[in-house]
A protein has these predicted regions:
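Non-catalytic beta/alpha edge segments that cap or flank active sites
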Residues: 1-121
């Protein structure tokens, strides 16, 4: 793992508003804090604009050469630019639908999410 033997994690926030400075990255910061409180060492937190290609590019850069958890937040709704699932599918090699289903159970609004999970490498 690493010198602290804590599992490693990275966080990607997908939001046009955060990129353009019209919104605070509340969900990304909350996710970093949640992972840290649950024993993960968060080594990277990035922000990208919405769009499948931008998400795929960011996720690939974060995943390649990294053995750990990469989590994204944002862009999983039904608006035209909410394309995080499409970008994620372009990067992962095998889907893990049970993980996405379990995450949706944690929030009453989870059923409105199109989030996906999988592995790369």
């Amino acid at each position: 793992m690493n010198e602290t033997s804590r599992p490693l994690a990275k966080v990607l926030t997908v939001s046009d508003g955060v990129v353009h400075g019209t919104r605070d990255d509340l969900s990304g910061r909350a996710l970093v804090e949640h992972l840290d409180a649950n024993g993960f060492e968060v080594t990277d937190h990035r922000v990208t604009a919405d769009g499948a290609d931008l998400v795929a590019e960011s996720l690939a850069a974060m995943c390649d050469g990294f053995a750990g958890l990469v989590v994204s937040t944002g862009g999983t709704g039904f608006a035209p630019r909410d394309q995080t699932p499409e970008g994620t599918r372009a990067v992962i090699e095998r889907e893990a639908p049970g993980l996405a289903e379990a995450m949706r159970l944690c929030n009453p609004l989870g059923r409105l999410s199109r989030g996906v999970a999988g592995i790369r490498g």
